[in-house]
Amino acid sequence: MEIRRQGLIVWLHSLKQAKMLRKFGNVHYVSKRLKYVVVYCNMEDAERIIAKIRSYSFVKQVDLSYKPFLKMEFESKQDKAKEYDYKAGL
């Protein structure tokens, strides 16, 4: 059984409180220059965690990651070399 995970992007006013976000899930990345933190949590708990994180005064904004909703199976295109094969008519 695989647990579905959801990424949360938390924009902060100051990075001093970034450690405090560890209690909500796994802190995957902290950007010092852009002042945001990527936190992974269980998908069924995401709405409750977002509401709790937004209540803090040091949080500017909380965004959801769209990665779980993207189709990760890609179709291959034909090779351009095969498309312009000039020796086929000889």
Swiss-Prot record:
Cystines in this chain: none
Family: Belongs to the UPF0298 family.
Domain of life: Bacteria
Protein localization: Cytoplasm
Protein name, entry field: UPF0298 protein BLi01717/BL02989
Keyword Membrane in annotation: no
Taxonomic lineage of the native organism: Bacteria, Bacillati, Bacillota, Bacilli, Bacillales
Keyword vocabulary terms for this entry: Cytoplasm
Chief location of this protein within or outside the cell: cytoplasm
Keyword Cytoplasm: yes
A GO-annotated cellular component: cytoplasm
